[in-house]
């Protein structure tokens, strides 16, 4: 796996869920240049674990740092650019709003607009095929 990490092919995806009545919702965001996405980033050689990388990416892209528990869910060969994704369930120790914006330092500073998507529902937003497939993978792992 070290070669894939060096090639920047190994991705970490912190999965943030919440209950809304009987539904389970997944945290997503609208990227100003690339439609709707899940929080995701690259596993670095300096990361001590997949879980620590997921926590780093979650904070970098959303500002969320109060994670009470990180649980490894599984991996997925995405079929996109030889990317291997690792999903990590991140339980948040605070109530998050329905929508919010976060200014990330990615690409010189971008505003990401966060929202919740009900798992099992058809997406009502535009996203790259790898992200729609990743959402389906989260549904398999979590519901």
Residue ranges: model-predicted function:
Residues 9-11, 33, 38, 83-85, ...:
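Short connector loops at helix/strand junctions that flank enzyme active sites
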Residues 10, 77-103, 112-121, 130-142:
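Active-site-adjacent beta-strand/loop module that shapes the phosphate/pyrophosphate-binding cleft
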Residues 16-17, 28, 90, 116:
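Conserved hydrophobic "DFG−1" position in protein kinase catalytic cores
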Residues 22-64:
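Conserved Nudix-box catalytic region and its N-terminal flanking loop in Nudix hydrolases
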């Amino acid at each position: 796996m070290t070669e894939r990490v060096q090639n920047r092919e190994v991705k970490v995806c912190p999965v943030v869920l919440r209950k809304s009545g009987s539904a389970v919702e997944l945290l997503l965001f609208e990227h100003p240049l690339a439609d709707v996405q899940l929080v995701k980033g690259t596993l670095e050689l300096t990361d001590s674990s997949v879980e620590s990388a997921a926590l780093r990416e979650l904070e970098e892209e959303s500002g969320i740092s109060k994670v009470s528990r990180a649980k490894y869910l599984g991996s997925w060969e995405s079929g996109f650019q030889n990317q291997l994704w690792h999903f990590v369930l991140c339980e948040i120790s605070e109530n998050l709003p329905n929508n919010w914006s976060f200014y990330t330092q990615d690409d010189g500073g971008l505003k990401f607009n966060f929202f919740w998507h009900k798992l099992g529902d058809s997406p009502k937003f535009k996203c790259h095929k790898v992200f729609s497939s990743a959402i389906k993978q989260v549904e398999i792992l979590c519901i």
